[in-house]
Amino acid sequence: MWLVNHGGEREIIMKYLGAAVSDTGISKRTNQDGVCIKIADTEQHGQIAMCVLCDGMGGLKKGELASATVIRAFIEWFEQQLPWKISGGIWDGLSADWERLVKACNFRILEYGKQEGITLGTTVSAILLMEGHYLIAHVGDSRVYKIAGTVEQLTEDHSFVAREIKRGNMTEEEAENHPQRNVLIQCVGASGIVTPDILHGRTEKGDVYMLCSDGFRHKLSTEEIYEEFRAENIGSAEIMEDKERYLISRVKTRNERDNITVALMKCEE
């Protein structure tokens, strides 16, 4: 089904499948990751879907509080603000909305940390899917991938090693075992100033978007991810969840020590 927007451009009315699994892992006592999926039906725009994934800082106190704070803020935005915002221009202002939302979360968590005398923080990777488009907001080293024929990383890690690789000072092989491989150069709640990456793009029927914490991806190859998560292999939310649990179990057998979280969103017409 198609809809023509005010600018005369054809927009696709899509439906979405989504599923997410989060696991404490084999060594940690608490799960500091957080994830949510929200899908809403609208009369004018078809389904609108949002997925948000956060990884609370494992080395910081109360990381689960930081991740939960950001997840809750995005859910409130989706349920309370998005409905009246889309009654006008579809994408007008949504990017600025998400940037303000992330910065507000950063301020709130920073202030809480000051009051309690602790440091806490979280990554955030969020995607909004609507009418053949996606919007992504990203801070940290959780990731968003697009799976459509290949596995394409859409986000850039805000980490020390990623920055050094980009500058040509380090190889990817060196980064894998570098003592500062887990150091982030910005995260929500532990950085004085946070500047989220905001990304836009078009979606097609059959596109799959994967959000994951670093604990999920460290022990898996892109070939393994593609084989399980390509569109033809995930025909329902139940199958999605089964395959997510299968890969998480594989990661755990490979001695991953972190919390492990993965979410999938599939575009359908």
Label every PLM stretch briefly.
Residues 2-269:
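PP2C/PPM-type serine/threonine phosphatase catalytic domain
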